[in-house]
Amino acid sequence: MLIEGLASVFLETDQSGDRVRPGAFAESLKRSRSFPMLWRHRPGAIAGVWTRFCETGRGLEVRGMVDTAKPYGRLADQEISRGLNGLSIGFRPQRWRFRPDGGRDLIELDLVEVSLVRDPMANGARFRVIETSDLRRVA
């Protein structure tokens, strides 16, 4: 199953008060183009593979394949069929500043992984299925 979406939405304040600034992933993406697709941020719970990462004016856009040959990929496939469509980034903040409201503006992030989740911290961090090999879903 091929999916794509926004893993991080620039300038959207998430549930924790963080707001990712445009360009926050630039250095991280220069260092690596390979980050795991995890199930709910669980280390080792590989659900698939991300094949594309791109910073756009909207945020960090991703594309990847859910691998139903893997246990967490099968679980993800089942949950996606029930409406799961959230994405969440795992990261280490490199540069940030606090805002007067107590939240953080995240200026530079070291991306670690992108997870499939039910309830993303950033409401706009969502994906959609763009291709499936399961003919039952197409019919």
Regions found by a protein language model. Give the residues of each.
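N-terminal "first-domain core" detector
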Residues: 1-25
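Acidic/polar N-terminal loop/beta-strand segments that form early-domain functional surfaces
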Residues: 8, 40-42, 65
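A short, contiguous, amphipathic alpha-helix enriched in charged residues
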Residues: 22-37
